Amino acid sequence: MAYVTSTQLYNWRFTQDELANQRQECNAAVRRRLSAQYRAKAEVKGGDVPAEPTFLTAEEEFIIVKRYIFAMKELFHQFSDSGLPVDVFGFAATYLKRFYLNNSVMDYFPREMMLTALYLACKAADYPLGLQTFAAHIPRNREHYSEIVVHSELFLMEKLQYDIWIHTPYRPLSGLLVDLLAYRKTQLGEPMTIEAGEVATADMMTSLKKEGYEIIHKWFQTDLCLTHSPSQFALAVLLELGQKHPDLGVEKFVKNSVCEYNSSDELMEQKWTALNEKMEQIQTMIGEFEFLSDLTYGSDLEAVLMQCRNPLYDPLSEEYAAAKEQAEKLMSFLD
């Protein structure tokens, strides 16, 4: 299925304002519900009512989700022995982004949803791993998280409206790099170089793909997968590579080959202007974004989350144990 006819475009493409509004509305609704839940529990217990926990803001929730996308990238690299394709990370990161548009980290703990998203992504990207193989790459509490993943997979699919096929920017970037190297060789007659000197075309392709894919991995911390098409995402990454390696002549390639720019064609001039504006928007977003480079950032928010998370979904809480016991009694009655 092409992107232009996909659910990704029709169901999961937003403006920055729409994303901000959805997150604010979701956060406000959860805060109201958890606050009411807390007061009701305090009234039942009676006596002195302890202070209500501090709840996370929408902005703080975004930081936590960003933190777990970074953690997911680190975990993804642990699967090198399984040969997971890069699309798996793109699928999983997009799932997590979509899920937390309409759901809160205060309800559904991000570590659990991150693992579930990664496991589901393996299947959706046509590279299924057995649960034992998957769990073997989880650093700790493997049995606990295996159970969580099994019980959360269908729930995640439902929350994603079963839109689990993702068009990622990896393949478009690959195609652009192939065209770039062909353009340099046939049109410009330039040697294949990257600063250090002449490099074989295949080696250069491998090097640029690796570098470009790492940029894509990093940029999944932003909302690019929700605000722009995969091809625009990929083109922005190519331009980023061009800034890192000026000798590649990326801008000339984009203008002359990708866009086939002709200044005498008014329609072409308009398209070129529109594309430049799109790329400038992305570059501004990337330039202003605060990327995570290690997991120490946001650890204070994680501590707040542990205090304010919904006890009904916390396996260690009394409320969760009571709800589980009630569900088991109901199931035994049905048997």
Swiss-Prot record:
<dbReference type="InterPro" id="IPR036915">
    <property type="entry name" value="Cyclin-like_sf"/>
</dbReference>
<dbReference type="GO" id="GO:0006357">
    <property type="term" value="P:regulation of transcription by RNA polymerase II"/>
</dbReference>
<dbReference type="InterPro" id="IPR006671">
    <property type="entry name" value="Cyclin_N"/>
</dbReference>
<dbReference type="Pfam" id="PF00134">
    <property type="entry name" value="Cyclin_N"/>
</dbReference>
<protein>
    <recommendedName>
        <fullName>Probable cyclin-H</fullName>
    </recommendedName>
</protein>
<dbReference type="GO" id="GO:0005634">
    <property type="term" value="C:nucleus"/>
</dbReference>
<dbReference type="InterPro" id="IPR031658">
    <property type="entry name" value="Cyclin_C_2"/>
</dbReference>
<keyword id="KW-0539">Nucleus</keyword>
<dbReference type="GO" id="GO:0016538">
    <property type="term" value="F:cyclin-dependent protein serine/threonine kinase regulator activity"/>
</dbReference>
<comment type="similarity">
    <text>Belongs to the cyclin family. Cyclin C subfamily.</text>
</comment>
<comment type="function">
    <text>Regulates CDK7, the catalytic subunit of the CDK-activating kinase (CAK) enzymatic complex.</text>
</comment>
<keyword id="KW-0131">Cell cycle</keyword>
<dbReference type="InterPro" id="IPR043198">
    <property type="entry name" value="Cyclin/Ssn8"/>
</dbReference>
<dbReference type="Pfam" id="PF16899">
    <property type="entry name" value="Cyclin_C_2"/>
</dbReference>
<keyword id="KW-0195">Cyclin</keyword>
